[in-house]
A protein has these predicted regions:
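Phosphate-binding site recognition
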Residues: 1-124
């Protein structure tokens, strides 16, 4: 049985004007599981970051404002090659506004990189 959220993910992935997706919801309801499953099915590779106390990751989004430098740093941190249009980058447990702000440049400049940020905290 396919979940309604999977249909939403497919529409998001195929949208011409795709922006980073911020998935907000209560804790422990399956957000991360559903995104990881979607990544396994739909992408060549899935790059997962748990942002809890990840100072290196936070530093990337605080310091860099170039999409290419952010992608390069994420590749180095994960040890994975991030492919345009064929990698899903998951940022889990996002509570830092700097990460959300950093993702906004991918909405305005590059829709070739597929980001999903998962949080249980509403952005202020």
């Amino acid at each position: 049985m396919e979940r309604k959220i999977e249909e939403f993910y497919h529409k998001w992935k195929n949208d011409i004007i795709r922006k980073p997706l911020v998935l907000y919801g209560a804790k422990q309801i399956g957000k991360t599981f559903s995104v990881l499953e979607f990544g396994k099915k739909e992408y060549k590779n899935t790059v997962y970051f748990n942002t809890d106390n990840n100072k290196e990751l936070l530093g990337v989004f605080k310091k860099e404002r170039s999409t290419e430098k952010i992608i390069l740093n994420l590749s180095l941190l994960s040890g994975e090659t991030i492919l345009k249009d064929d990698s899903l980058i998951i940022l889990d447990n996002v509570i830092e506004n700097d990460i959300i702000k950093g993702l906004k440049i991918f909405g305005s400049e590059h829709s070739k990189y597929h980001f999903i940020a998962i949080t249980s905290k509403k952005e202020k």
